[in-house]
Design a protein with these regions (language model features):
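Terminal domain-start leader segments
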Residues: 1-254
Length: 254
């Protein structure tokens, strides 16, 4: 892991970045992530399901909760990464740690797809004390992860309505009725479990979690599904077309 940190810091130095935040997350804020988004595990060697890694120029630390204290101590031993035990009085907040280890005017980076707006606001407020800048548009880990697993592409299938309880048409109609009541023209869905429910869509992108990585925009006449289209089975395609759901590539949401 020390060699990985050296490589990562080299990439950070190229962009004049003083600190890098690597959460355990994906663009959908999923609790358990697929291997493509397991960047924190790749860099730290810690395999627990929850944790945030911060890499600074001369130090690094990983925050995790009480479920993983013993595991993290073992897996981080000799890595050059300090363990920060969430909930302990002596454990600083992530943003406070960064402020303490950065000089005024330096830059803090993170993959903006993986951080919620609320968390970004918390960081921004704390960073004002030293006028730290935030960089959100570079995936630094991707630069050094030469054998990074590909995005999942498991075949999709429709969950039978006798188990789902309602058809896609019925669910869309209910949501559109709520949108009309709220005078909303569009509803953006980023949570993959919500999309799985709405479209009765299932896949095997994440172990033990039968979902597909996708985005969805619902409008008053139908919607748009953003997903790797090559993985859609014919039954799913026919269902979506029938319900006026356009299909576009996953990255097209941006």
């Amino acid at each position: 892991m020390k060699e990985t940190l050296i490589q990562l810091r080299h990439e950070m130095e190229k962009e004049n970045v003083a600190a890098l935040i690597i959460p355990t997350s994906d663009p959908h804020s999923t609790e358990y992530v697929c291997e493509h988004f397991a960047a924190r595990k790749f860099v730290s060697g810690f395999t627990g399901s929850a944790g945030v890694l911060v890499v600074c120029k001369d130090c690094a630390a990983l925050w995790t909760d009480g479920r993983y204290f013993l595991q993290a101590e073992s897996q981080l031993a000799g890595s050059g990464i300090d363990l920060m035990k969430i909930g302990q009085a002596e454990t600083p907040a992530i943003e406070d740690y960064i402020v303490d280890h950065c000089q005024a005017g330096e830059t803090v980076a993170f993959d903006g797809r993986l951080i919620t707006v609320n968390q970004a606001d918390t960081y921004a407020e704390a960073f004002e004390a030293k006028q730290l800048h935030m960089m959100t548009d570079i995936d630094f880990v991707d630069r050094i992860w030469t054998d990074r697993p590909a995005m999942p592409d498991s075949q999709t299938f429709l969950y039978d309505v006798k188990y789902a309880g309602k058809s896609v048409a019925d669910k869309l109609a209910e949501i559109q009725a709520c949108m009309n009541k709220a005078e909303a023209d569009h509803l953006i869905l980023t949570k993959i479990d919500e999309i799985a429910w709405l479209l009765n869509l299932r896949a095997k992108d994440i172990p033990y979690y039968p979902v597909a990585l996708a985005y969805m925009i619902v409008h008053r006449e139908g919607g748009t599904l953003y997903i790797n289209q090559a993985r859609l089975d014919e039954e799913s395609r026919a269902c979506f077309e029938k319900n006026h759901i356009e299909m576009k590539d996953y990255e097209a949401i941006y």
